[in-house]
Structures are given as structure tokens and as C-alpha cells.
């Protein structure tokens, strides 16, 4: 079975706008539903301990929406962040909702956004039991990684299904007009992951401007998760037209790729 690279829309920024006024508008569920109407293959959220955007009830409602609409639900987050008032912890959320995919990300509480991947040598011992637990719930496990990450074979042994390439460095180089070298590094990392049986996702600062070039250079990317750029572009172009433009890019730049 094969599929083209899939688009999962991160709706965190919708929640940021809603929370800025403390009311229910804009409606995160309505926005996610519009993305699905436009053809998005999935919805991504990254709940944080400070509830700065996505909240517990959003996760519950989005889980129900994605299952009803037959698209994937991807929950991202730091599995080591301690539960606290208003935040039950990433694993508790995933245990409750059983998303299709859980993407583990090593972000700190004070980070504005994710900016690095896991160090497998240092953090692997702590990750392994969490991976086992998540997979017992029937969820696919993806780890957020930097380009040129080492230890991919170890991750495969732990039961990891996919990696998500942190594409921030590529986006910076593309903006500067000098992305060829870093693209080669991303392509090499993707191939190394695929050689040990890992699927490859990608995300962070991907946009209509740079997505096509990335997918044209990096082989067999199964999924891209895009939020900030897509929501920013949607302010000018509309949400449904923007999602469709991303889908057009996916259709134009890569053929069907093997599912993992």
C-alpha cells in the first residue's frame, strides 16, 4: 500500500488567538473541521503544561472529531514534563484519547517553540519505557530529531515507528538562499532512518514557500505537520484555500511513497 505525503495541520495557533480573549472564538474544533473539509489528512496538537494554547478539553474534542471524520490525530509533547494544575501530563492525555500518533518532543516549559530533537545516547534510557507504554495503547510513536541525529538503529530497536525531522534549520537556510548543503544532510538522515525501518515525518517552519523544495530533495517523507505558517497564510488567503494550496504542493512534488 502507498500514499502521497500527508498533511497534518497543527491548530495550536487557533487556540492562541482564542485564549488571548478568554472566550470561545475562534473555535478550534470548527477550524480543525474546516481543515479536514479542505482535505487535510490529519490534525496535530502540542499541548503544553502552561496551557498557553491547546487545553485538555480541546484534546478530548479533537480526538472525537478526528475519529468521526476518519483522519489521523497526532499529539505532540514532552513526555518528561511533570503534571500540574490544568495539565495531566502528555502520557495521561494519550492514554485517555489513544491518538493515531504520539510525537515525543524534548521541549522545555519556557520554550516559545520546539527548537531541537532528542539526544538518543543521553535520553534513550528514559524514553524506552515510555515508548513501550504508548505502543501498548495502539499508538504509533514518532521521535522529534535533529538532522544528522545518531542512534537511529537504536530507536528502531526500541520500537519507534517514525522520526520527525526538525526542519527549522532548513527553513532558515532556504530563507537565506543557501539551502543546498543542509538539504543534502536532511536527505542523508532520511535515508539512514528508512534503512533501519523507520518512517520519516517532517515539521517546523515549513511553508508554501519552502515545502516543495524540501520534499523534492528529501526522499519518501510520509507526513508533514504544519501550523504557524499555514495559519499565518490563512489570515490573507482563507483557511480552506490555504490548506488546498498545501495539498496541491504535495501532489505536485512527490509521487506515492511507501507506508511505514
Swiss-Prot record:
The active site is at residues 46, 76, 204. It is found in: Cytoplasm. The keyword Cytoplasm applies. Keywords: Cytoplasm, Pyridoxine biosynthesis, Transferase. It comes from the Bacteria. GO terms for cellular component: cytosol. GO terms for molecular function: pyridoxine 5'-phosphate synthase activity. This is Pyridoxine 5'-phosphate synthase. It comes from Xylella fastidiosa (strain Temecula1 / ATCC 700964).
Amino acid at each position: 500500500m502507498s500514499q502521497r505525503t500527508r498533511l497534518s495541520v497543527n491548530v495550536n495557533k487557533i487556540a492562541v488567538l482564542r485564549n488571548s480573549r478568554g472566550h470561545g472564538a475562534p473555535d478550534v474544533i470548527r477550524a480543525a473541521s474546516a481543515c479536514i473539509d479542505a482535505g487535510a489528512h490529519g490534525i496535530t496538537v502540542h499541548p503544553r503544561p502552561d496551557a498557553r494554547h491547546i487545553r485538555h478539553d480541546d484534546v478530548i474534542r479533537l480526538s472525537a472529531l478526528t475519529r468521526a471524520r476518519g483522519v489521523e490525530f497526532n499529539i505532540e509533547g514532552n513526555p518528561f514534563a511533570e503534571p500540574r494544575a490544568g495539565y495531566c501530563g502528555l502520557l495521561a492525555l494519550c492514554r485517555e484519547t489513544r491518538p493515531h500518533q504520539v510525537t515525543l518532543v524534548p521541549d522545555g516549559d519556557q520554550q516559545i517553540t520546539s527548537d531541537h530533537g532528542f539526544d538518543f545516547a543521553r535520553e534513550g534510557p528514559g524514553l524506552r519505557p515510555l515508548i513501550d507504554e504508548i505502543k501498548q495503547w495502539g499508538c504509533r510513536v514518532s521521535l522529534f530529531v535533529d538532522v544528522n541525529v545518531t542512534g537511529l538503529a537504536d530507536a528502531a530497536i526500541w520500537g519507534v515507528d517514525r522520526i520527525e525531522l526538525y526542519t527549522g534549520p532548513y527553513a532558515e537556510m532556504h530563507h537565506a538562499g543557501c539551502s543546498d548543503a543542509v538539504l543534502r544532510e536532511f536527505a542523508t538522515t532520511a535515508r539512514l532512518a528508512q534503512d533501519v525501518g523507520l518512517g520519516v515525518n517532517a515539521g517546523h517552519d515549513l511553508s508554501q514557500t519552502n515545502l516543495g523544495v524540501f520534499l523534492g530533495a528529501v526522499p519518501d517523507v510520509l507526513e508533514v505537520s504544519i501550523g504557524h505558517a499555514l495559519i499565518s497564510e490563512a489570515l490573507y488567503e482563507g483557511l480552506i484555500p490555504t490548506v488546498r494550496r498545501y495539498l496541491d504542493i504535495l501532489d505536485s512534488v512527490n509521487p506515492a511513497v511507501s507506508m511505514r
